[in-house]
């Protein structure tokens, strides 16, 4: 019996992140040999460019990619999808107020949330990469009234990966030696990369690095890495964001490695004092697609203040989109 293809929607499909992401998905980085059908959404002016991307996907002759559909109508593109990568978003431009950014993205994610609600498969998982990712995910989830909130998440895996690399470099080890890294809060400069539970080659990270490095180098480097990449290459991180996006959804559709956890922004259940309903990053384990927040971690005063500050920013963003009538 022929296996039914998994339908995967990707928005902003002609953009920079997707120029890396689509080829990773199609080559099997997400679901291995499982047959897939790509559903690609773009704004009308970008459809011509998207046709060129589809030509390149065709020219790769990926064995598990059985079909590609493109369009500018989310209700058509999202029909029956099992996974949705919401990558397309309005970037903040010079002189743009935060409320303008939230309004413009609010319109995008309101429409996409409603479309997913109406036509996506019952098992759909929705991962938001387009920034401000946490609040965009909240808007989409709130407008998808029939889809459980725990089917929505925002990407903090890129921050998680950045943090692992910085700790591995500092300790002279490899990223494979680093376990139990945690990102808390918002995917913004208030995020809190937490090494206090991390291990490097079986040793507590805090026995290998000092607090001055953690506070003055590690946290700012991870939190501001996106800006540093823009300064260096004149464009935002795309390939690394695509890689993290694939890794996050791959784990979400499967399981995290035994004995480790990952970071993922999901609707808070009140754990660690993060107000319920905010889409905030937590340490999570995943077993056969079921996501659970790691419980019982000791949070010292330093970490408490950092987690609270990022949660406050998320609450402020939620309140702002409420005032704008988006949720």
Curated annotation (Swiss-Prot):
Binding site for NAD(+): 12-18, 105, 112, 129-131
SUPFAM superfamilies: LDH C-terminal domain-like (SSF56327), NAD(P)-binding Rossmann-fold domains (SSF51735)
Record-listed E.C. numbers: 1.1.1.37
Active site: 187
GO biological process, one term: tricarboxylic acid cycle
Enzyme class, broadest EC rank: oxidoreductase
GO MF assignments: L-malate dehydrogenase (NAD+) activity
Source domain of life: Bacteria
Binding site for substrate: 92, 98, 131, 162
Catalytic activity: (S)-malate + NAD(+) = oxaloacetate + NADH + H(+)
Pfam families xref list: Ldh_1_C, Ldh_1_N
The keyword Oxidoreductase is assigned to this record: yes
UniProt keyword terms in alphabetical order: NAD, Oxidoreductase, Tricarboxylic acid cycle
Secretion signal, residue range per the UniProt entry: none
InterPro entries reported for this sequence: L-lactate/malate_DH, Lactate/malate_DH_C, Lactate/malate_DH_N, Lactate_DH/Glyco_Ohase_4_C, Malate_DH_AS, Malate_DH_type2, NAD(P)-bd_dom_sf
HAMAP family tied to this protein: Malate_dehydrog_2
Function: Catalyzes the reversible oxidation of malate to oxaloacetate.
PANTHER family: MALATE DEHYDROGENASE
Family per record: Belongs to the LDH/MDH superfamily. MDH type 2 family.
NCBIfam families named among the record's database cross-references: MalateDH-SF1, PRK05442.1
The protein, known as: Malate dehydrogenase
Organism: Cutibacterium acnes (strain DSM 16379 / KPA171202)
Top-level taxonomy: Bacteria, Bacillati, Actinomycetota, Actinomycetes, Propionibacteriales
The encoding gene: mdh
